[in-house]
Every structure is written in C-alpha cells, then in structure tokens.
Amino acid sequence: MKTRQANSFRRSRLLWIGALAAIVIAAAGAFFLERKASRTFRGVVPAPTAQSSDYVDPAECTRCHRDVAATYRKTGMGRSFSKASAASAVEDFARANTVDHRLSGMRYEMIKRNGELFERRSQRGFDGKETNVMEERIDYVIGSGNHARTYLHRAANGQLIELPVTWYAESKGYWAMSPGYDQKHQKDFFRAIKPECMFCHNGYPNSDTKPDAGSLHLDAALDRSIFPAQLPEGIDCQRCHGPGRAHVEAASDSHSSAERVRATIVNPARLGRERQLEVCMQCHLETSYLEPNEQRAFDRPIFSYRPGQPMADYKLYFLPDAANATDDRFEIAHAAFRLRKSACFRNSQMTCLTCHDPHDIPHGPEATAHYVEACLSCHRGVKHTVALPAASTCLTCHMPKRRTDDTVHVVMTDHFIRRTEPARDLLAPLAEAVALKRDVTNVTLYYPEKPPATPAAEIAVAEAQMNNDHGMERLQTLLERYQPDAPEPYLAVAQEYEQEGNEPEVAKWSRLALEKRGNFEPAIVQLAHALFATHQDAEGTRTLEEGVAQYPQDDLLLSDLGNAYLRSGETAQAAAVLERAVKANPERSESHNLLGAIARGRGNLSTAEREFRESLRCQPNDADANDNLGNLLFERGVYNEAAFYFEKAIDADPMFAQAHHHFGRLLAVMDQLPRAVAELTEAVRESPEDFQIHEDLADLLAATGHEGEAAVQYGRVLELKPNHPQAQLGLGITLLEQHRPDEARQHLEAAAQGLDAETARRANALLAQHLR
C-alpha cells in the first residue's frame, strides 16, 4: 500500500471541505427554538374597571390641597417618574461619564447634547477601532435621585427600553451598570420593561390613551409591553387615596356635605391596620427577587388595585424556599417584608404611618430626629445597660443603613428592627449576583396567611407553585375544573412545558390560551414557536400570519413570519415582511440578520454583510449574526476577521454547535489543526446527531494522523446516515492507513456505488491502485 499517496489524498480532501464551506444561516433554522416569551403575564381588563372613568388629572387635587401637594412633590414618590430633561438633570454628563463594562465588553458614555440626554454604547472591533456604536435618547427617568436614577428610551414600536447605565446617589453620585446588568450576558439596549415595573414607579396610565397609532386598546398593548404615548409623571395622590373623580365632583358640588366629600375618597389613616398596610405594601412588600415572589389573580388587570380593597383579591405574595435559606438577605423593596419580621411590628399595632408621613418626608438631621421621636413614642423609658458610642441613636443600632443585596450600588435603611445589628460591615461593596431559574424550587404562601376562597385565588396559588411537587398537575386540574376566561394561566402551563422541552404540550396549552382570547400576542408567539419545533411549519406560518393580521405593526410577529417564509424557501415574501419589521422597529437585530441571510442567498454579499453588521450594531452579542458574518468573511477569504466573529459567536453562546463547527473548519484552512480538532470536538459534543460535524471531524482527525479516532467518527456518520458515500470513502481510506485492506474494500466499494460521481471516481481509483 502506498501510504504517502493515501495521506496526500486525505490532506487535499480536508482543504476541499474547508475551502467550500457554505454559509449556514443559523437564524433561519434555530430562531424559533431559542425565542423565549416572557414569564410574567399581563391581565385582561374586566369591563367594570375602566380606569379613565374613575381617575382624574392629579392637578385637580392641587386646587384644594395646595400645601400638601407642594410638599408631596418633593418626596421620592412624587418624583418617581419623569420626562428626561437636560435642564433638570442632577447627574454629571460631562466628567466621569463613561462606564467600561469588562464582563460584556461594552463601553457606555452618557452624553448631554442640544438639550437632550443620551446613552451611547460602543465596542472595540477586530481592528481595534470603535464598532457597534449605538446611541439611545433618554426619554424618561425612573427614580427620584434619592438613591438612583435609571433611564428609559421609547423605541419606535412604543416599548420602553431600560438603558444599561444608572446614576447612583452614593458617594456624591456616580455612574454604574443598572440593576441586573452587571453580567456577561446583560441586556444592553434591548430590555423592554413590563407593566409590572411601571406599576410601582408611576401613576396609572389613562386607558383612553391609544398607545399604538390609535389602533389598540391599552390592555392589548400592555400584553406586548407597549405603553401610551402620554404617561403620568410620578406616583400621584390616587395611588394611595383611590380614584378621585367622585371626590372632585362631590367637592365641587356646593350641596355636598363634608361627610359626603370624605366618603368619596380613601383616607388610609382611617383604614383598619391590614388595609392601611396594604396601601404601602402594594409596592414595598417584595419577599425576594427570586421568582415567583407574587402572583396576580387572573381576573385582575395590572392597574386594577384600589386602596382599601383587600390586597389578596388582587395578588398573593410567596416566599421561595431558596430565599428562606438566606434569612438575612436585604433587598431594595424589602421595607415591609423586613418590618413584618420585627418584634415591634408583631407585638403592637404599628403601621408604616406610625413613622412616615408620605406627604412630607424629612431629610438629614431633621429626619433622624423625627424617626428617633417615633421610636421614643413607645420606648421612652428604655435604659441601656451598656455604654453607647457618641452620636449614636436608636437607628444606629436597631435600624442601620445597609447595602442592598439585589441593587448593590444603593444603601437604604433596614426596616428589620432588632436588638443588635449584624456583626459585619453592612456598607461593604457587593458584587451583583443573579440566581438562575433552576435555583428556585418550592415556594410557600407568605401573605396573606390564607388565600381567599375563590377560584382566582386557588389558581393563583397553583400557578405560583408550579415547580412545587405535583404543582403542574394541580394547576391543570384547577384549570379543567374552573375553565377561567383569562388566557394567562393557560399560557403559564405552556411556558412551563417549554422549560421541559415538551413542545406538543406547549402547543396544546397555547391553543387553550388563544381560545380564551384570540388576540393574546404572547400565546400567538408561543404557539408558533412550538409548531415549528414540532415540524408543523405550515400551521406555524398560518398562526403568525393570523397574528400579523391582528397586529400589522408588531415587529416581533413580522420578524418571526419573515423567518417562517425563509425556512420554507419563500424568499420574496420573507424579504417583504422583514422590511416591514425593520420599518416598525429599525433596531430589531434578528430582522437584519434574516435580511442578511436572504441577501447572501441571492449572491448579494455586500448587502448581506451590511445587514449582518447592522444586526450586530443593534445587538452585539447575537450569536447567530456573529456566526453568519464569520461565515461570509470566511467565504471571502478574510480569515482572521472571520475567526474574530466566530469567537464572538461562541462567547455569546458557548453551546452553539454550528459556530464551533464553522470555526473548526476555518481553523483547518488556516492550518491551526489542533485548535480545529478542539472546536469540532466541541461541536460534536453539543450536536451529536449532526452527521456533517462528525464527518468533518473525522476528516480532520485522519489528516492529523489519528486514524483510530477518525474511524470512530466515520462510523458514527454511517450510523446517522447509512451508505453516505463520502463517509464510506473516508472510512475506506482510514482503514487503508491502518493496514486493514479487507475492511477498507467493503467501504470503498460502497463509495464507488454511490450517486456522487466524484466520490465514486476516487473510490474506484483507490480500489484499482491498492486492492485489485
């Protein structure tokens, strides 16, 4: 046998595979499987709770309560949400206004220009130059600035995007990553806030406001996290006192008695203890940042809570077992949760109003004196038996300021009133840590002690406890028993099945959700993804077409529909729909990525490259777009830059088999064979059923003298794709290298009989040269 000649043949075949590596448009095949719908759901609005008929412009309150309104406007709640204004900015946008986030490789700069405020993001590109530059205008500010100010940008589709850098008041003010963003895979400029966020940071939006070019009711828009063009600015009087229209009308009527005027508004001071506490707890009781920490009743829309109504009719609070394990964890929304642990609270009738006047919050030394006096109203006779440090007060030891565990750049007062403070530095810097979903196990009902005896409450408990033992079965039983009209609980089951990878059940429960409300966009998206995952492409496409018919400007549905058309080879339709998606939202990364795929398929490489780069400008850590750009550059022979983008794809998604595969092919062409073997081995590990990866790895192993390992990989190819002629040829050559001619003959003869003419010719040549 002429071993050198066989080796030469093997080497040439390896280069042939690398040089002709075709672009694999990963997004077109995998996107539906990777999209995750939100785990938090919006409610449907029952007819009797139309907010616009009950609420008034908060300015109406000022007419009679001018002094109270003036002091309230200075409180944190009164300044909780506002339009951004360069004139009123407390931050320094000129000095120390950059954040280099090493974990994600992003650089952010805060800019003031022409009376407007912006956050600018950039990265260092392949050549060391600035790339992926995106600038978003700051349209709204969340937070009073007492502790922090976070920023929102209104996207073209009406969503409010939380920006990644926040200003923190500690240490005279500085910039750092927003809560939840100090992570490698942070959300950058594409995290749309949910209505639940707005619930506690602002007044209720007016349901008469049309949020989507006048075409949608508020509640259908909130399903998609789209907010009205006009929003309240700050938590107003009606969040604590209830809807004010009846009160204003009574006060404006000269015939109204004082009793009638008082009866038309809620005065929290006159409520019983629990109802009074609940007015504050609607926003200041969070048991844990781990989810689920609360569950709203399916028959209550997000903005339907009214002061004085039992909170349990609106939502229930839960405590994850994982949170119980860390009993002294302190979070930013923990005030009521920590207060309820205190002996002072448990052994008295104290409420939040015992210490706080929500209309007038003191600061500095005045605040200290005020709160110490509140303590002394019950503890004036206490005599300390130990020497106290100079200048210490009740608050110093019993309610110290602490750094919050979930928002690590904020220091707040711990409302857990206890005899001695923890023996550690409560202000020490903390690193942000975010728990994974798998870290959350069972949850138990925290508040109230017993839920209301209603189907809505029973279902809410079951929905929150889906991950408890037999939780899914319990929820499904209740849904079958009560048949609620709202779609959210059904979608909750569908999304839990998605976590398990049970796509047929995902489709079943998504359909049930849509039976309850046919325009429920999260269920449309969920159903479509499940149908594509189960190879029901035609039905999945129809589902998306029906969704687009209902929401013609929905860039998510349009992008998914374009993807569906591309999968089925309908490139003209795909391109048209994706252009609509880009028009609706120019910053949807996947739309640009898919348009790049279409341009690449048409041979328009310059357009393809432009779209792939635009996709990455919108979302730099998009693994698919990085991989697609890497493939395009690979084909053009721009190897070093191609390697840069393949590495970016793998960094974004280390389990992305095709990126490892493509990078391995490139490395083989670049003659970096050990690295190529490592990448292809990783690709095989992540995608063991892909015969092409096994074949490429086998070719590479054989070319580098690892015939035994190569034979194993060729054997795996033939298990996955029997009689595959190229694998038969490769295995035959490998067996010749191992001096196993009889076994080699079998595979070379099979290759010679295959339908691929070039493979057959080479197999016949080897048979003639070595075995005949």
Regions found by a protein language model. Give the residues of each.
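Terminal, low-structured helical/coil segments at or just beyond the last alpha-helical repeat
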Residues: 737, 745-772
